[in-house]
Amino acid sequence: MAARSAKYMYQSSRAGHGGDISIEYGTDLGALTRLEDKIRLLSEDLESERELRQRVEREKSDITVQLMNLTERLEETEGSSESVTEMNKKRDSELAKLRKLLEDVHMESEETAHHLRQKHQAAIQEMQDQLDQVQKAKNKSDKEKQKFQAEVFELLAQVETANKDKLVAQKTVEKLEYTVHELNIKIEEINRTVVEVTAHRQRLSQENSELIKEVHEYKISLDNANHLKGQIAQQLEDTRHRLEDEERKRSSLENHAHTLEVELESLKVQLEEESEARLELERQLTKANGDAASWKSKYEAELQAHVDEVEELRRKMAQKISEYGEQLEALLNKCSALEKQKARLQSEVEVLIMDLEKATAHAQALEKRVSQLEKINLDLKSKLEEVSMLLEQTQKDLRVKIADLQKLQHEYEKLRDQKEALARENKKLADDLAEAKSQLNDAHRRIHEQEIEIKRLENEREELAAAYKEAETLRKQEEAKNQRLTAELAQTRHDYEKRLAQKEEEIEALRKQYQIEIEQLNMRLAEAEAKLKTEVARLKKKYQAQITELELSLDAANKANIDLQKTIKKQALQITGLQAHYDEVHRQLQQAVDQLGVTQRRCQALTAELEEMRVNLEQALRAKRAAEQMHEEAVVRVNELTTINVNLASAKSKLETEFSALQNDYDEVHKELRISDERVQKLTIEVKSTKDLLESETERVTKLETIKKSLETEVRNLQIRIEEVEANALAGGKRVIAKLESRIRDVEIEVEEERRRHAETEKMLRKKDHRVKELLLQNEEDHKQIQLLQEMSDKLNEKVKVYKRQMQEQEGMSQQNLTRVRRFQRELEAAEDRADQAESNLSFIRAKHRSWVTTSQVPGGTRQVFVTEQESSNF
């Protein structure tokens, strides 16, 4: 007998884990007990590995359930309910196929187990055929080794693909971080623009305060002008009282002249009868002395300029008493002198009549002006009615638009209810799917063989990769949408800038036109003033020359009358010229009134724009509420989908869309701020134009006051001349005085009309002041609205920061989920490797019942199993 031992060695290396498996087996008849112990240990290891595998499968099934729920939710948000039902049907069919496959695999596994048992029994019975079987097993082990190596290479390729996917995901994350950084930079730029807008607003408020101060100064100047106007009216009343006093003086002088004529007739009778006339003359002298004393006592204060003439009369009367002969000659000389004075007074009265005719012509012109102003007033009333009709129409349109908005809101609420109903149905379907998946997981737990499990894991990996790719495609689609929205935003911004440039050009053209018109008006006023001054100087010179000629040409009265008529015609022509200049000035005033009407229409347009701004503000508030609702929904979704990577991608895309919507809202707010600033600038320009108009009107008022003062000086000169004429007037002046009185009444009526017109102008000025106050109030309201918009922008910035923080938190959660998934994958791979090793060891051990098994554990994680088989033979 000699003992023969055969030793076989099997080595296998796993590149993924760095562990080597070496199997040495031989035949030993005395090692069965130890082999059974090792088999027991290996079976226990197998059971522990199976338990670990089942636990991993449970966790994996939970993760798959969560993945399916998330994919269903994504499909609910992106697609419609029909697509979801089709996908569910497809998944049900796939689940049925998988169940059939699992049942087939289970049957096959049972059959293989039974077959292995039979083989084990046959191996125990037939010990001699073990060598051939060992050789066959060796060949099989070589084949299995090749298979394992191929599987290892496949697993390495999968690891490389996973690493590539990881790099791609990291690149996408870096891109997203770069986009977030760019968005932060944009937000900082927007904050800077908001700060600039606030500074511009403060500057506008300062300018507004300065304009208010200027308006206050203008009010003070208007009050001073009104005070001067009252003083001028008082002066006119004083002149009227003086005229009445002069009329009374004139009537007294006429009575005195009549008495003098009676005395002349009595003196002629005395010449014929000297003796009788002496007594009568003495009586008349006594009467005349008494009358003269009475007249002297009455009119000493009133006729200081005519005291010399009264004294001459007294001396002449004394000479009559002393020397009758000399008195007759003196009386004749006096009569001739009185006739000359009468002729001179008549010429002066004719001059006064001409002046009064001029005054009547001026009164007629003023009446025409009044009629024109009434026509203008009627036109303005008609325009005001038209504007009121337009305002009512716009209000009706506004109401219609508000009703349409309410309808749209109602439809939006209906759609939201439908969306909620669809979400409920999708949740029900998700629950059904979860139940089906739980059943599928129960079926999976029955599977014991590792190869089928590896295939299933590979399929699940492919599904995860497909889901990851789908998420990547969705992210790319969202990025394309974002780029398209940014392009549209840039296009709209460019369009708005073009419109603003066109409006600014139109405003500049209008400003230039108004400046040209104002310069033309100033030139015309200057020309009219120069012409008036030259004509007044020429008239003064002519009047002085005529007065000298009249004084020198007492003998040629008829020629002087003819010359006076000629001069009267010339003066009438000059008056017509002055009236034409006055009409031009009035036309310019009318143009100024039209410009005021234009400014009022602009103010109405500005009020309409303010109403539009309010409507836009309401829309912005509604958008803000909608954004808050969307934010709440997003928060709910984020709380639901914090543990899953796919949900992170969907939530991230939603947050990006919401951020773009908020960015659009912020751009709209910025545009509204810019539009409000432009409107404030327009208001300041219009206030400046009204200020210039007020200055021009005040200048015109001052010019009119100077003209009025010159006319008052002329009236005073005329009054002095009238006093001289009345002092030297004789019989025949009553009718002239009556005419003068009627003319003076007409002049008084004209003065009253002028007062009334002045009162109307004051009313217009008050209305303008009221309008300026309204504009200031509107400006303050605009500032308040700007402040509200700024507060809204601050709130939006805060929301953006919250969204950023939530995105960062979700990214952290996604990274945690990725690490967990990778850890589970590593554990699964390790468990699969251990199961493969255990199964291979069992197969070899069951094939060889006479074997001696030794195991050793390397600290690096490798496990070595030594099987030694010995065979004895007798020679």
UniProtKB/Swiss-Prot annotation:
InterPro entries hit by this protein: Myosin_tail, XRCC4-like_C
* Domain of life (superkingdom): Eukaryota
Give the species this sequence originates from.
Blomia tropicalis
The UniProt keyword set, sorted, is: Allergen, Coiled coil, Cytoplasm, Motor protein, Muscle protein, Myosin, Thick filament
Asked whether the UniProt record includes Coiled coil among its keywords, one would answer yes
Q: What is its main location?
A: cytoplasm
Using the record for this protein, list the coiled-coil segments as residue ranges, or answer none: 29-854
Q: Does the keyword Coiled coil apply?
A: yes
Q: Family, per the entry?
A: Belongs to the paramyosin family.
Q: Where is this region: Disordered?
A: 110-143
For region Nonhelical region, the annotated ranges are 1-28, 855-874
Subcellular location(s): the record lists: Cytoplasm, Myofibril
Q: How does it assemble?
A: Homodimer.
Any idea what this protein is called? Paramyosin
A Pfam match:
Myosin_tail_1
